[in-house]
């Protein structure tokens, strides 16, 4: 596989990631910060099912720090998703490099405390977490598996933007 074909495969993977992230953000994640009357009962039921099935304490009773991440997702990330999807599906859009690096760094930074909390928080003693909680290490790993793609794909994006020769190349503008 040539360099162009490999680059296009990664761009398509990234495009799919950003397209898939739009409904997840709108219909699941933002229920924690937007008024409940904005959502049909089916979406509320879906969130309730997910929270109980996976014992996700962050989505059952979101702590304030987690809500701040979701607010950033609403204000900064959600508007970026269709722009990034367009750029990666179209391909060869060097202008996406800096915004993609900013997005990736921001997302990776937010996922670190989320994953750390899911792995190491003593939910039995934590006042902020009510409802069902992961009780076994296996349940914690299952939850980490749900959140991990949102760390791994931005990490791939970051490395792709920093290391791919096509995106590293800076076009010199002609002087008039």
From Swiss-Prot:
Query: Which segments cross the bilayer?
Result: 10-30, 69-89, 100-120, 141-161
What are the record keywords, sorted? Endoplasmic reticulum, Membrane, Nucleus, Transmembrane, Transmembrane helix
Give any Pfam family that matches.
Answer: EBP
Q: Which residues form a coiled coil?
A: none
Q: Which is an annotated GO molecular function term of this record? A: cholesterol binding
**Hey, where's the site called Likely important for receptor folding on this chain?**
56
UniProt-reported outcome of changing residue 95 to A? No change in 20(S)-OHC binding
**Residues in the Cytoplasmic compartment per record:** 1-9, 90-99, 162-176
Short motif ER retention motif, span? 172-176
What cellular-component terms does GO give this entry? Answer: endoplasmic reticulum; lysosome; nuclear membrane; plasma membrane; rough endoplasmic reticulum; rough endoplasmic reticulum membrane
The residue spans the entry assigns to the Lumenal side of the membrane are as follows 31-68, 121-140
Relay the domain remarks: The EXPERA domain doesn't possess any sterol isomerase catalytic activity.
Family membership, please give it.
Belongs to the TMEM97/sigma-2 receptor family.
**Any other comment in the entry?**
Sigma receptors are classified into two subtypes (Sigma-1 and Sigma-2) based on their different pharmacological profile. Sigma-2 receptors are identified by radioligand-binding studies as a binding site with high affinity for di-o-tolylguanidine (DTG) and haloperidol.
Binding partners and assembly: Homodimer. Interacts with NPC1; the interaction impairs NPC1-mediated cholesterol transport. Interacts with PGRMC1 and LDLR; the interaction increases LDL internalization. Interacts with histatin 1/HTN1; the interaction induces HTN1-stimulating wound healing. Interacts with TSPO.
What is this protein's name?
Answer: Sigma intracellular receptor 2
Which species does the entry assign this protein to? Mus musculus (Mouse)
Q: Please spell out the taxonomic lineage of the organism that makes this protein.
A: Eukaryota, Metazoa, Chordata, Craniata, Vertebrata
Q: Could you tell me the gene encoding this protein?
A: Tmem97
């Amino acid at each position: 596989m040539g360099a162009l074909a490999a680059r296009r495969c990664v761009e398509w993977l990234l495009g799919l990631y950003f397209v898939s992230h739009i409904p997840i953000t709108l219909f699941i994640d933002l229920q924690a910060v937007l008024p409940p009357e904005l959502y049909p009962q089916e979406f509320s039921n879906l969130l309730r099912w997910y929270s109980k099935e996976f014992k996700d304490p962050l989505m059952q009773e979101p702590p304030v720090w987690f809500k701040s991440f979701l607010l950033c997702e609403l204000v900064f990330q959600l508007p970026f998703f269709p722009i990034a999807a367009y750029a990666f599906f179209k391909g060869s859009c060097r202008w996406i490099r800096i915004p993609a690096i900013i997005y990736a760094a921001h997302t990776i930074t937010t996922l670190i405390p989320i994953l750390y909390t899911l792995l190491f928080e003593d939910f039995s003693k934590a006042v902020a977490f009510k409802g069902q909680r992961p009780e076994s290490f296996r349940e914690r790993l299952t939850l980490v598996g749900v959140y991990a793609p949102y760390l791994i794909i931005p990490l791939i994006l970051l490395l792709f933007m920093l290391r791919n020769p096509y995106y590293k190349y800076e076009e010199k503008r002609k002087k008039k």
